[in-house]
């Protein structure tokens, strides 16, 4: 049984119309719980909130440097983008540099969130392609790593070297043994962990500057890339982009489906993970805003 707590309430005048339950965990640079609300031990699927972890092998393998990837591509490898031109143009160029095409993706087509792109497709009668998928940046990273490793085309399968590398990074950063996995909306495996484990992984990213190993240095590069390009991480009108801009490069925010959010706060050496029980984005957006802004202001540190 979950020990969730009320995190968000919606009121209409004097009447409370709905309440969203969930859990929040903040971990410090030792991986221990700094503060928590609800159930830190609940097992979740992080969904897209852990894309930074999945992108680590892209750098630690040498594939990123071998292909001359810059901050723009690294940010897109961690993105859940809107499918605006600001996202599609660099991913298209990235694919061309690899000598690959849309059909080499394994994420599947998806209608873009960006209204300009979506309306353009409707006007021209063109179907959405795989590049429009909000995870196509992550999959461009997978393709880059796969090409570097010389793996077979189905890089999304759980026993593929690309996914094995992502899984190893996941267990390393969460410091847990995963209990299983589900197939994410973009066809790649998404491994389970406790909410504390996910917060611990984010704290590992937040304190990466203190360490000299290759994985930690890769984490620093990913955090810096996301901070340098907040518009690429999600896009206009999205909580991640807006909150990262408001924080002025002092924190990384990453959304995941079904009410998951993560935050990396390097200055405080803190990592945050939250899960809304009913999976609603309106509640996870609001919760992330409150707890991240308070943690960034050291409110929890007094």
What are these regions (language model features)?
Residues 46-64:
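Active-site SXXK
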